[in-house]
Swiss-Prot record:
Assembly behavior: Heterodimer of a large and a small subunit.
Cofactor annotation comment: Binds 1 nickel ion per subunit.
Location(s), subcellular: Cell membrane
Protein name per the record: Uptake hydrogenase large subunit
Top-level taxon of origin: Bacteria
Length: 604
């Protein structure tokens, strides 16, 4: 391969200098990225690779379906809960189990707590340092920082010059100690960083504030699910009873005091996303107003299943509607059916798996998980020490899911594009007001269709979705209290708990709007045991390698045509890949074409 044109509109040229970033980060294991840059340091080819095999689908075969949630929840320790929820929904769908209204509301609150928490932690503690230079904050004027805070977030109480001076002094002592800790190995002199010292100081202060609030919001999981991470779920409902006269002993049922605690944490989250998170994203974006790279597939093909039904089992009441948009046509949204084998298929032509016919895709109900680790003839290195992958062959442990044959992007940005296009008034007001604030500060006149499909737009969508989730949680809490006051304390339906009540064979699916995008689990049950289990998680969609037709996935597409200041300091690669929300910090090595180490960075 030198230059090829993909069916989904990308011109790939791997003749230029190769830069390898390995690992970038992880969601279910590690991710590697290789790019080719031309003589102007513009990315002309991108290769995204999942470098660890999960294998949970194999582990689950022959197990009790009622236990599946506890296994799949361990797929990830950060997006904790969304896989468990998808699993219990899949089993309930297969066995035609309907959960009580209170169980639905409690699950909704737990799911939205995860969404809010994950988005806040992602932005402040994983992604912000791709935009924010904390060392530069030492040059800031605390008084000017206070004025900036009043301009972009006037309702935030911690905004005095003295407050920012204290933060700056703490940061100064940290830097002068020579132990930068979480800020070590950053490219702080890279010209890709554009913020003023005052904006850097404000964002660094909020980085620290977010550390405090994120540990408070997850206490809701401990109340409803017993712990965090990995709260408990159950097929048929939720594992927490309601008794308004109960005490506060460990393991006691929910009472009003605990429910009031839940409401207080939701209200704190609502205020933080409104007064800090969203204003921060808008303020930071104004310094990067010309950096509208990274849109990739979000400019053309997006997909989601929809979630957060106001009335359980009625998809028409989803507060974030699903669907698919192709070719950037926001005027036409196609329905998505997870049960349709013509719509959702996974391919393995470039994945380290075997299929009976690798030119064809398989629906998850018929999915096969048989590993086949084989490197292409143009791979540089060995099986255990790869220097450069051969993207013309198999090169990833991630399969290639496609919707009606199309590579699509999933995630909060996809959900917001879909809901803006479908007239969701809450989403429209959020997007329009945020873009108006951005245009005013930046002196631009961007439309939603110009601004959203970008790395910055992807980051903004997460902030807006976090706040929407906080607003929905308040409604869920009020409805739950109303049910309890009306005498309804049911939280589980155990009519079909006994496997003797199940059919000999059954199949089902469970769908969740996970923090990183469309999350689906498909199950086949035979003789009371799991016969087949397949997950298509958000990073499977976004991080997929090429399919048999040559279409590239969302990660690869998002990097195309991005200019880099210094390829040996891949700020731009990390910035865009992190906008998809990688989960955990891990060490990153950057290597030249012959494998020589050029730099080492710790991705935060």
């Amino acid at each position: 391969m030198s230059v090829i044109q993909t069916p989904n509109g990308y011109k790939l040229d791997n003749s230029g200098r190769r830069v390898v970033v390995d690992p970038v980060t992880r969601i279910e294991g590690h991710m590697r990225c290789e790019v080719n840059v031309d003589s102007n340091n513009v990315i002309r080819n991108a290769v995204s690779t999942g470098t660890m095999w999960r294998g949970l689908e194999v582990i689950l075969k022959g197990r009790d379906p009622r236990d599946a949630w506890a296994f799949v929840e361990r797929i990830c320790g950060v997006c904790t809960g969304c896989h468990a929820l998808a699993s219990v929904r899949a089993v309930e769908n297969a066995l035609d189990i309907r959960i009580p209204p209170n169980a639905h509301l409690i699950r909704e609150i737990m799911a939205k707590v995860l969404q809010w928490h994950d988005h806040v932690v992602h932005f402040y503690h994983l992604h912000a340092l791709d935009w924010v230079n904390p060392v530069n904050a030492l040059k800031a004027d605390p008084k000017a920082t206070s004025e900036l805070q009043q301009l972009v977030g006037p309702n935030h109480p911690m905004s005095s010059p003295g407050y920012f001076r204290d933060i700056q002094n703490r940061l100064k002592r940290f830097v002068e100690s020579g132990e930068l800790g979480i800020f070590k190995n950053g490219y702080w002199d890279n010209p890709a960083y554009k913020l003023s010292p005052e904006a850097d100081l404000m964002a660094t202060a909020h980085y620290l504030e977010a550390l405090d609030i994120q540990k408070e919001i997850v206490k809701i999981h401990t109340i409803f699910g017993g712990k965090n991470p990995h709260p408990n779920f159950m097929v048929g409902g939720v594992p927490c009873a309601i008794n308004m006269d109960g005490d506060l002993a460990a393991g006691a049922p929910l009472n009003m005091e605990r429910l009031n605690f839940v409401r207080a944490r939701i209200e704190e989250a609502y205020e933080f996303s409104k007064n800090v998170y969203i204003p921060d994203v808008i303020a930071i974006a104004t310094f990067y107003k010309g950096w509208l790279y990274g849109g990739g597939l979000s400019a053309t093909n997006v997909m989601d299943y929809g979630d957060y039904a106001k009335v359980n089992y009625d998809k028409s009441t989803d507060q974030l509607k699903g669907g698919a948009i192709l070719n950037g046509n926001w005027n036409e949204v196609f329905p998505v059916d997870a049960a349709d084998p013509e719509q959702i298929q996974e391919f393995v032509a470039h994945s380290w798996y075997k299929y009976p016919d690798e030119a064809k895709g398989l629906h998850p109900w018929d999915g096969v998980t048989e590993h086949n680790y084989a490197l292409g003839p143009n791979t540089k290195g060995t099986r255990t020490d790869i220097k450069q992958l051969d993207e013309a062959a198999k090169y990833s442990w991630i399969k290639s899911p496609r919707w009606r044959g199309h590579a699509v992007e999933v995630g909060p940005l996809s959900r917001y594009i879909l809901n803006y296009a479908q007239g969701n008034q809450y989403v429209i007001e959020q997007v329009d007001s945020s873009l108006a604030a951005f245009n005013k500060l930046a002196g631009t006149n961007l439309t939603p269709k110009q601004a959203l499909p970008s790395t910055i737009g992807r980051t903004l969508a997460r902030a807006l979705e976090a706040h929407y989730c906080a607003a929905m949680m308040l409604d869920d809490w009020k409805e739950l209290i109303g049910n309890i006051k009306a005498g309804d304390s049911s939280t589980a339906n155990v009519e079909k708990w006994d496997p003797s009540t199940w059919p000999k064979e059954a199949k089902g699916y469970g769908l969740v709007a996970a923090p990183r995008g469309a999350n689906g689990h498909w199950i086949r049950i035979k003789d009371g045991k799991i016969a087949n289990y397949q997950c298509i998680v958000p990073t499977t969609w976004n991080g997929s390698p090429r399919d048999p037709a040559g279409n590239i996935g969302a990660f690869e597409a998002s990097l195309m045509n991005t200019p880099m200041e210094r390829p040996e300091e891949p700020v731009e690669i990390l910035r865009t890949l992190h906008s998809f929300d990688p989960c955990l910090a891990c060490s990153t090595h950057v290597m030249s074409e012959d494998g020589e180490n050029l730099a080492k960075v710790t991705v935060r």
